[in-house]
Amino acid sequence: MKTPIELKILDSRIGTEFPLPAYATPGSAGMDLRAITDTQLVIQPGETVLIPTGIAIHVADPSLAAIILPRSGLGHKHGIVLGNLVGLIDSDYQGPLMVSCWNRGSEPFTIEIGDRLAQLVFVPVVQAEFKLVDEFNQSDRGAGGFGHSGTK
């Protein structure tokens, strides 16, 4: 199923030097977001930087949201993760997409112009309405949390 999402190009290199975000395979859940900067960036250990992607989106449909997730190889191999862990883009947001990158590693890391640094994934949204209760119906788990079910 394909859902149209409005995308605005903010940097003229998108679509010429660098491709629009796209799914790499028919089974891909996310589209790669790239560092669309004027120069390479060096992220020092412990440093967090905000990196432009060169695009803005407007999801518009309140039953959808977009999330920005890390690329697994950057985190595992180089210690580069999202500074906010997950970026949430509400359906009514219309601004530029930025990626917060945090170098949790011990070495400086260089991001070149156009490097793929995160993934954009669209997810369904359900808006809840709270129903106030005095007690919950008993469940098997109850209030057990934070390791309650064990590791084995």
Swiss-Prot record:
It catalyses: dUTP + H2O = dUMP + diphosphate + H(+). Disulfide bonds: none annotated. Its cofactor is Mg(2+). GO terms for biological process: dUMP biosynthetic process; dUTP catabolic process. Its EC number is 3.6.1.23. GO terms for molecular function: dUTP diphosphatase activity; magnesium ion binding. Keywords: Hydrolase, Magnesium, Metal-binding, Nucleotide metabolism. Pfam families: dUTPase. Substrate binds at residues 71-73, 84, 88-90, 98. It comes from the Bacteria. This enzyme is involved in nucleotide metabolism: it produces dUMP, the immediate precursor of thymidine nucleotides and it decreases the intracellular concentration of dUTP so that uracil cannot be incorporated into DNA. This is Deoxyuridine 5'-triphosphate nucleotidohydrolase. It comes from Shewanella pealeana (strain ATCC 700345 / ANG-SQ1).
